[in-house]
Amino acid sequence: MNIQRITIETSSDAVQAAGAFYRDALGLAEHVAVRAASEPSSGFRGFAPSLIFVQPGDVDAAVERALAAGAKVIKPVAKSLWGYGGSFLAPDGTAWQIASANKTATAPATGEVERLVLLLGVDSVKASKRFYQEQGLTAAKSFPSYVEFDSGDVKLALYKRASLAKQVGIDPSGSGSHRLAVVAGGTFTDPDGYAWLTAESTVHAG
């Protein structure tokens, strides 16, 4: 089962602006849609998409566009053990990670996205892994604290909620709706309340 796109929910008066942000600042019109939220939400929503570029220069350029469009820095971009990256809060309140595996440029920046990963913060990685395998997903990487599935253009990954919040640099507390719907080949709700749909009415980021 492949993920076709993710749908982020926001207040009805911010749908068009949020769609423009993902389209113009991040270039994600194909894989991110936006719709009006129907349930309240506060604090950390439990998930964090991760946008991975090939070159660190693309990380800098994307962050610059995001901040100019109203995003707020959570972690400034910097070199780390894993590469080069940081995190920011989108205008709709979604926490994003942005990174490159390359700490220094190996070629000129081109804007090439290597992959988009949807990181879900879960209560039990083991239980959630089993649940998603029962839905037909295949684990491509599997560790006690992290699992990544082969799910098409948008990769699905599982991480403990508190660990994900720490990695992003945000307070783990939060309540209410996740304000997220995953559009794929099945309709279900996972053990942590993340909704999956086969089709829906959305306003696309494109």
Where are these regions (language model features)?
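Glyoxalase I/VOC metalloenzyme domain signal
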Residues: 1-74, 89-143, 150-206
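Short, small/polar residue-rich loop motifs at catalytic or cofactor-binding pockets
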Residues: 81-83
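RNA-recognition motif
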Residues: 77-79
